[in-house]
Amino acid sequence: MFKYNCLNPIASVGLDLFSGDYEKVEDLGQADAALVRSAAMHELELPDSLLAVARAGAGVNNIPLDKCAEKGIVVFNTPGANANGVKELVFAGMLYASRDIVGGIDWCLANQNDENIAKTAEKQKKNFAGTEISGKKLGVIGLGAIGVLVANAAIHMGMDVYGYDPYISVSAAWNLSRSVKHISNVEDIYRECDYITIHVPLLDSTRKMVNAEAIAMMKPNAIVLNFARDLLVDEEAMVEALAAGKIKKYVSDFPNPTTVGAKGCIVTPHLGASTAESEDNCAIMAVREIRDYMENGNIVHSVNFPDCSMGACTTAGRIGMLHRNVSGMISQYSTTLGDAGMNIAGMTNKSKGDYAYVLIDVDSPVTEEVIQKLENIEGVLKVRKVK
């Protein structure tokens, strides 16, 4: 029996995928796996029983990745599950920034008691006129699941699309429209594009990547959209530029005292993935990742360990071992198994940065004695008898 804990409400359509071999517990200290959305985990005490954390969403800034890795806890996310919901809101942001829709709505509310509002509106509507997005240049920074959807949809809406991502995956490249112009220098996007939308993860290398220097390169009519992470933009520099009329609008999905109410800022309360479909998709993917790891030892969509999969186990036993990515590990655990008289029927070893993971299928049942001997190898973080 596996036990799981939900640190946030998780859509029932996902939780319903757990079989009868899983039990929901209210205490994280009793859990083998945890599902989380936005709950902060950095200060939580992580129990030794915890094997996996699945983030029902893409961002993992609320999860202590290094701490989890050191304790042999695999952290998963659900890339692409909420991509369409975010994509749609990006285009809503473009339209709100291009045409004063909000101003027009506010005007109607302020004049709701005017019996002649229809006639008055015809005279006032020029105050809320804007521009169309068709024919404009859109720069997409980051061509992951969301960025690719935004770029492709913009092509169909008649925009001239420029894409920048030096680390684009093979899958994303295959899915990207051939009409998207590939840019090798992000500064070209800053200088040339009417709309700039950011879709990169928050890393040390991307923190405040849109800074005062980048903003200074932009057109005075530029509109910047941020539906990724607020810390990707130096928002104090952005607000100063907006106040000075150096760019037109900043659209953000991350409200804070700096941007809310500031001139030229359109801010929404983190609505990007707040659709029933996105929440369902994230929950479904998160539960499937947990089940595949708990039942088969397979890692798919981990952010702190390498992806590693051998399908379902068809031999007498399977061992999963998380360890440091150092030389000599393969020979040590191969020798340990050989000394125990166990034949390796199949094995896959993958590494990612400082950490690695190995799945080993064996032709005889896995004993606790063998598990203990593997745990005693220097550099091993966690060993698990999968079958």
Residue ranges and their predicted role:
Residues 250, 260-263, 271-387:
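NAD(P)-dependent dehydrogenase/reductase Rossmann-like domain
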Residues 1-78, 211-213, 217, 223, ...:
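An N-terminal-biased, well-structured beta-alpha scaffold segment characteristic
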Residues 4-6, 140, 321:
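Hydrophobic Val/Ile/Leu positions in short beta-strands of Rossmann-like dinucleotide-binding domains
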Residues 136, 143-144:
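Glycine-rich Rossmann-fold phosphate-binding loop(s) that bind the pyrophosphate
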Residues 87-106, 152-159, 285-298, 334-338:
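Oxidoreductase and adenylate-handling cofactor-binding alpha/beta cores
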Residues 39-44, 166-259, 274:
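Rossmann-like adenosine-cofactor binding region
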